[in-house]
Amino acid sequence: MSLQSIKYQRGSLEILDQLLLPVVSKYLPVRGVEDGWKVINKMQVRGAPAIAIVGCLSLAVEIYPEEFSSKKSLRQEIEGKLNYLVSARPTAVNMKISADELITLANELTKDDAITVEEMKQRFLKATEAMLEKDIADNRAIGANGAKAILEHVAEATGVATAGPVRVLTHCNTGSLATAGYGTALGVVRNLSELGKLEHVYCTETRPYNQGARLTAYELVHEKLPATLVLDSMVAALLRVKNVAAVVVGADRVAANGDTANKIGTYQIAVVAKHHGVPFYVAAPLTSIDLEIPSGDHIIIEVRPDREMTHVGEHRIAAPGINCWNPAFDVTPASLITGIITEHGVFKPEALKVEITKLLEL
């Protein structure tokens, strides 16, 4: 059974504190927007889909008991606080897209004279709550599409009708802890396992925050999947000797040309995969694709505190006084990406903008 990172019922929200994993499993109450901003910014919840869901649900929890004198005041509350939540971690686009969609809904309901202020509030609550179910459904579709693409690639490359079990590599954490459930890149791994086609999964430690060692390894052990943890610096050696069939990672933001911002270290894995002829896939829902930016050059890269590099917990591991550069993300050029796995199919980076535009017009 997948782990549950988000617990929600109307008026109540709790998140699994990911800073304490894998040693302690503790849920934190999120009582409103300030709590939501803090748990996102401090990375007690992380993963682009989960950030958006927790951010929006934190507002739903806050406005649930409130009474509003007018639709205008409710709209102002929604718009102001959603924009504030976007600032918690700006690289991940899902929160921004979700905020824009909910603000658009609020504006439309404000203009509709047939809708009362209470009806407007209920519509908003239902819209935020629907994000949970949709994310899980989207993740399952991503998992199925990604597994199919990897197995088809292996079958074609080896000249067989049906591929046998495969070995894959993943980076950072893209599973139930990063989403509403099931996961994106880790959803692909789960689907391979469900099909009986997963021989082994390798996960990187993902320095400096160790999401792979702390979170992905935790999920894989929890589900008893055949898995091995490797250091970030071992990837080239791994791809050379372990017959890895594919690399599959998540995304915090995908530009219109397919350039992808993901956890720091993703870019170098893509370079190494290209050298070894290993297909490199990005698994991301449509909410992680930002057609408004033409390339990765326009993606804002969050820089995290030095302490995340110099300390593990309370223990210093770097020399006092050393300067640090700690970007949380890097951008993998589209030229290194084999395919972008979405809930609607797998797209070549060069075809992404056209295909996604078609889907959005439906």
Swiss-Prot record:
Group of enzyme by EC: isomerase
Keywords recorded for this protein, A-Z: Amino-acid biosynthesis, Cytoplasm, Isomerase, Methionine biosynthesis, Nucleus
Residues annotated as site: Transition state stabilizer: 172
Sample GO molecular function, one term: S-methyl-5-thioribose-1-phosphate isomerase activity
EC number: 5.3.1.23
Superkingdom in the source lineage: Eukaryota
Gene3D superfamilies in UniProt: translation initiation factor eif-2b, domain 1, Translation initiation factor eif-2b, domain 2
Compartments, as annotated in UniProt: Cytoplasm; Nucleus
Biological-process GO terms, alphabetical: L-methionine salvage from methylthioadenosine
Pathway: Amino-acid biosynthesis; L-methionine biosynthesis via salvage pathway; L-methionine from S-methyl-5-thio-alpha-D-ribose 1-phosphate: step 1/6
KW Amino-acid biosynthesis (keyword) present: yes
Residue positions of the active site: 252
Predominant subcellular localization, coarse grouping: cytoplasm
Keyword Iron tagged: no
An example Gene Ontology CC term for this record: nucleus
Catalytic activity, reaction form: 5-(methylsulfanyl)-alpha-D-ribose 1-phosphate = 5-(methylsulfanyl)-D-ribulose 1-phosphate
PANTHER family registered for this protein in UniProt: METHYLTHIORIBOSE-1-PHOSPHATE ISOMERASE
Physiological role: Catalyzes the interconversion of methylthioribose-1-phosphate (MTR-1-P) into methylthioribulose-1-phosphate (MTRu-1-P).
Family per record: Belongs to the eIF-2B alpha/beta/delta subunits family. MtnA subfamily.
Record-given protein name: Methylthioribose-1-phosphate isomerase
Lineage, uppermost ranks: Eukaryota, Metazoa, Ecdysozoa, Arthropoda, Hexapoda
